Amino acid sequence: MTRTIAIGDIHGCLTALDALLAAIEPKKSDILVPVGDYIDRGPDSKGVIERLMELREKTQLFPLMGNHEEMMLSVLDRRREPFGWLNHGGHNTMESYGFAGDLSVIPVSHREFLESLLPYYESPTHIIVHANYDSQMRLENQSADLLRWVKISHQMPKPHFSGKHAVMGHTHHPEGQIVQLPHLTCIDTYCYGGKWLTALELETQRVWQSTPEGEVREFMLEPVPSPAS
Protein backbone atom coordinates (compact mmCIF):
# COMPACT_ATOMS: atom_id res chain seq x y z
CA MET A 1 0.00 0.00 0.00
CA THR A 2 1.27 3.46 -0.88
CA ARG A 3 1.92 5.69 2.10
CA THR A 4 1.88 9.48 1.85
CA ILE A 5 4.18 10.94 4.49
CA ALA A 6 4.68 14.64 5.17
CA ILE A 7 7.90 15.69 6.93
CA GLY A 8 8.13 18.95 8.88
CA ASP A 9 10.79 21.67 8.85
CA ILE A 10 14.24 20.02 9.07
CA HIS A 11 16.44 23.14 9.34
CA GLY A 12 19.79 21.41 8.97
CA CYS A 13 19.12 18.68 11.56
CA LEU A 14 20.58 15.74 9.64
CA THR A 15 20.85 13.39 12.64
CA ALA A 16 17.14 13.82 13.31
CA LEU A 17 16.28 13.28 9.64
CA ASP A 18 18.36 10.11 9.41
CA ALA A 19 16.77 8.71 12.57
CA LEU A 20 13.32 9.50 11.21
CA LEU A 21 14.03 7.82 7.87
CA ALA A 22 15.39 4.73 9.63
CA ALA A 23 12.13 4.47 11.55
CA ILE A 24 9.91 5.12 8.53
CA GLU A 25 11.83 2.80 6.17
CA PRO A 26 10.51 4.50 3.01
CA LYS A 27 9.79 2.19 0.09
CA LYS A 28 9.76 2.86 -3.64
CA SER A 29 5.96 3.02 -3.59
CA ASP A 30 5.82 5.61 -0.79
CA ILE A 31 5.23 9.31 -1.39
CA LEU A 32 7.36 11.59 0.81
CA VAL A 33 6.53 15.29 0.97
CA PRO A 34 9.02 17.35 2.98
CA VAL A 35 7.30 20.69 3.56
CA GLY A 36 10.37 22.92 3.07
CA ASP A 37 12.95 24.74 5.22
CA TYR A 38 15.61 22.04 4.89
CA ILE A 39 18.40 24.54 5.49
CA ASP A 40 19.54 27.20 7.99
CA ARG A 41 19.74 27.30 11.78
CA GLY A 42 20.79 23.66 12.31
CA PRO A 43 24.32 22.25 11.90
CA ASP A 44 24.26 20.34 8.59
CA SER A 45 22.18 21.92 5.83
CA LYS A 46 24.52 20.52 3.19
CA GLY A 47 24.02 17.01 4.53
CA VAL A 48 20.24 17.41 4.60
CA ILE A 49 20.15 18.46 0.94
CA GLU A 50 22.39 15.54 0.00
CA ARG A 51 20.12 13.13 1.88
CA LEU A 52 17.01 14.46 0.15
CA MET A 53 18.71 14.14 -3.23
CA GLU A 54 19.52 10.50 -2.40
CA LEU A 55 15.89 9.89 -1.44
CA ARG A 56 14.79 10.73 -4.98
CA GLU A 57 16.40 7.44 -6.05
CA LYS A 58 14.69 5.41 -3.32
CA THR A 59 11.14 6.71 -3.10
CA GLN A 60 8.66 9.14 -4.66
CA LEU A 61 9.89 12.47 -3.32
CA PHE A 62 7.89 15.69 -3.72
CA PRO A 63 9.92 18.31 -1.82
CA LEU A 64 8.35 21.73 -1.31
CA MET A 65 10.11 25.07 -1.26
CA GLY A 66 10.20 26.95 2.03
CA ASN A 67 10.97 30.58 2.65
CA HIS A 68 14.55 29.71 3.64
CA GLU A 69 15.25 28.00 0.31
CA GLU A 70 13.70 31.01 -1.43
CA MET A 71 16.07 33.33 0.45
CA MET A 72 19.10 31.20 -0.37
CA LEU A 73 18.24 31.04 -4.07
CA SER A 74 17.69 34.79 -4.25
CA VAL A 75 21.18 35.32 -2.80
CA LEU A 76 22.73 32.81 -5.20
CA ASP A 77 20.96 34.56 -8.09
CA ARG A 78 22.19 37.97 -6.86
CA ARG A 79 18.59 39.16 -6.52
CA ARG A 80 19.01 39.85 -2.81
CA GLU A 81 21.81 41.05 -0.57
CA PRO A 82 23.00 38.20 1.66
CA PHE A 83 22.66 39.91 5.04
CA GLY A 84 18.97 39.16 5.63
CA TRP A 85 19.41 35.49 4.82
CA LEU A 86 22.61 35.17 6.84
CA ASN A 87 20.89 36.72 9.85
CA HIS A 88 18.05 34.17 9.60
CA GLY A 89 20.28 31.12 9.80
CA GLY A 90 22.01 31.36 6.45
CA HIS A 91 25.40 31.57 8.17
CA ASN A 92 24.81 28.05 9.53
CA THR A 93 24.16 26.82 6.01
CA MET A 94 27.28 28.45 4.62
CA GLU A 95 29.37 27.00 7.46
CA SER A 96 28.12 23.52 6.53
CA TYR A 97 29.53 24.08 3.03
CA GLY A 98 32.87 25.34 4.35
CA PHE A 99 32.13 28.85 3.09
CA ALA A 100 35.25 30.99 2.71
CA GLY A 101 33.81 34.01 0.92
CA ASP A 102 32.87 32.31 -2.35
CA LEU A 103 29.33 31.09 -3.08
CA SER A 104 30.74 28.67 -5.66
CA VAL A 105 31.37 26.22 -2.80
CA ILE A 106 27.70 25.23 -3.24
CA PRO A 107 27.60 22.41 -5.81
CA VAL A 108 25.64 22.98 -9.00
CA SER A 109 23.61 19.84 -8.25
CA HIS A 110 22.47 21.33 -4.93
CA ARG A 111 21.44 24.56 -6.60
CA GLU A 112 19.51 22.60 -9.24
CA PHE A 113 17.77 20.67 -6.47
CA LEU A 114 16.70 23.92 -4.80
CA GLU A 115 15.45 25.31 -8.11
CA SER A 116 13.34 22.18 -8.65
CA LEU A 117 11.41 22.49 -5.37
CA LEU A 118 7.62 22.53 -5.63
CA PRO A 119 5.19 25.22 -4.44
CA TYR A 120 2.68 22.71 -3.00
CA TYR A 121 1.48 19.10 -3.11
CA GLU A 122 -2.13 18.02 -3.56
CA SER A 123 -3.68 14.57 -3.21
CA PRO A 124 -7.34 13.50 -3.46
CA THR A 125 -7.71 14.10 0.29
CA HIS A 126 -5.01 16.58 1.38
CA ILE A 127 -3.17 19.74 0.45
CA ILE A 128 0.38 20.24 1.69
CA VAL A 129 2.01 23.67 1.70
CA HIS A 130 4.99 25.16 3.47
CA ALA A 131 3.28 27.96 5.37
CA ASN A 132 -0.28 28.99 4.55
CA TYR A 133 -3.00 29.19 1.89
CA ASP A 134 -6.04 31.13 0.71
CA SER A 135 -9.08 29.03 1.56
CA GLN A 136 -11.08 30.24 -1.47
CA MET A 137 -8.40 29.83 -4.14
CA ARG A 138 -7.06 26.87 -6.09
CA LEU A 139 -3.48 26.05 -5.13
CA GLU A 140 -2.03 26.79 -8.56
CA ASN A 141 -3.32 30.37 -8.28
CA GLN A 142 -1.95 31.14 -4.81
CA SER A 143 0.82 33.63 -4.22
CA ALA A 144 4.30 32.41 -3.35
CA ASP A 145 4.36 34.88 -0.46
CA LEU A 146 1.33 33.26 1.19
CA LEU A 147 2.47 29.71 0.50
CA ARG A 148 5.97 30.28 1.93
CA TRP A 149 5.97 33.19 4.37
CA VAL A 150 2.74 33.87 6.27
CA LYS A 151 2.58 32.13 9.64
CA ILE A 152 -0.72 30.61 10.72
CA SER A 153 -0.19 32.38 14.06
CA HIS A 154 -0.54 35.67 12.14
CA GLN A 155 -3.26 34.61 9.70
CA MET A 156 -5.16 31.42 10.48
CA PRO A 157 -6.66 30.04 7.26
CA LYS A 158 -10.20 28.76 7.10
CA PRO A 159 -11.01 25.30 5.70
CA HIS A 160 -10.03 25.03 2.04
CA PHE A 161 -13.01 25.18 -0.32
CA SER A 162 -12.03 21.78 -1.75
CA GLY A 163 -12.81 20.13 1.57
CA LYS A 164 -9.28 18.72 1.70
CA HIS A 165 -7.32 18.66 4.94
CA ALA A 166 -4.30 20.99 4.97
CA VAL A 167 -0.85 20.07 6.28
CA MET A 168 1.93 22.62 6.69
CA GLY A 169 5.04 23.64 8.61
CA HIS A 170 6.72 27.06 8.99
CA THR A 171 4.97 28.07 12.23
CA HIS A 172 6.90 26.23 14.92
CA HIS A 173 5.35 25.39 18.26
CA PRO A 174 7.74 26.48 21.06
CA GLU A 175 6.98 23.31 23.05
CA GLY A 176 7.36 21.05 20.02
CA GLN A 177 3.69 20.14 19.79
CA ILE A 178 1.74 19.31 16.64
CA VAL A 179 -0.95 21.93 16.05
CA GLN A 180 -4.27 20.31 15.16
CA LEU A 181 -7.54 21.82 14.01
CA PRO A 182 -10.39 19.99 12.27
CA HIS A 183 -9.23 21.35 8.90
CA LEU A 184 -5.43 21.57 9.27
CA THR A 185 -2.35 20.08 10.91
CA CYS A 186 0.92 21.98 11.43
CA ILE A 187 3.97 19.74 11.83
CA ASP A 188 6.76 22.25 12.47
CA THR A 189 7.71 20.98 15.91
CA TYR A 190 10.87 23.08 16.43
CA CYS A 191 13.60 20.51 15.86
CA TYR A 192 16.40 23.08 15.57
CA GLY A 193 15.26 24.50 18.91
CA GLY A 194 15.79 21.16 20.64
CA LYS A 195 12.32 19.65 20.28
CA TRP A 196 11.18 17.27 17.51
CA LEU A 197 11.31 16.59 13.79
CA THR A 198 7.91 15.21 12.80
CA ALA A 199 6.69 12.93 10.02
CA LEU A 200 2.97 12.27 9.52
CA GLU A 201 1.45 9.45 7.47
CA LEU A 202 -1.69 11.00 6.01
CA GLU A 203 -3.65 7.79 5.47
CA THR A 204 -3.38 6.50 9.04
CA GLN A 205 -2.35 9.56 11.11
CA ARG A 206 0.70 7.65 12.31
CA VAL A 207 3.41 9.98 13.63
CA TRP A 208 7.16 9.48 13.85
CA GLN A 209 9.24 12.02 15.75
CA SER A 210 12.97 12.33 16.36
CA THR A 211 15.04 14.66 18.50
CA PRO A 212 18.13 16.50 17.20
CA GLU A 213 20.17 13.73 18.86
CA GLY A 214 18.28 11.00 16.97
CA GLU A 215 15.95 9.60 19.65
CA VAL A 216 12.73 8.38 18.03
CA ARG A 217 9.17 7.88 19.20
CA GLU A 218 5.98 6.83 17.39
CA PHE A 219 2.29 7.34 18.13
CA MET A 220 -1.08 7.75 16.46
CA LEU A 221 -2.49 11.25 16.12
CA GLU A 222 -5.98 11.44 17.53
CA PRO A 223 -8.51 13.15 15.25
CA VAL A 224 -9.87 16.54 16.23
CA PRO A 225 -13.67 16.56 16.10
CA SER A 226 -15.38 19.19 14.01
CA PRO A 227 -17.42 21.70 15.99
CA ALA A 228 -21.08 20.80 16.26
CA SER A 229 -23.20 22.56 13.69
Where are these regions (language model features)?
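Active-site neighborhood of phospho(di)ester-bond hydrolases with catalytic His/Asp-centered motifs
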Residues: 7-8, 32-36, 63-66, 165-171, ...
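Active-site neighborhood of divalent metal-dependent phosphoester bond hydrolases
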Residues: 41-122, 149-157
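His/acidic metal-ligating clusters that form di-metal
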Residues: 106-176
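N-terminal active-site segment of His-dependent metallophosphoesterases
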Residues: 1-51
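Active-site environment of divalent metal-dependent phosphoester hydrolases
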Residues: 11-15, 40-43, 69-73, 135-136, ...
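Acidic, His/Gly-rich catalytic cores of divalent-metal-dependent hydrolytic chemistry
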Residues: 147, 152, 158-229
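Divalent metal-coordination and catalytic microenvironments
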Residues: 9, 37, 52, 66-67, ...
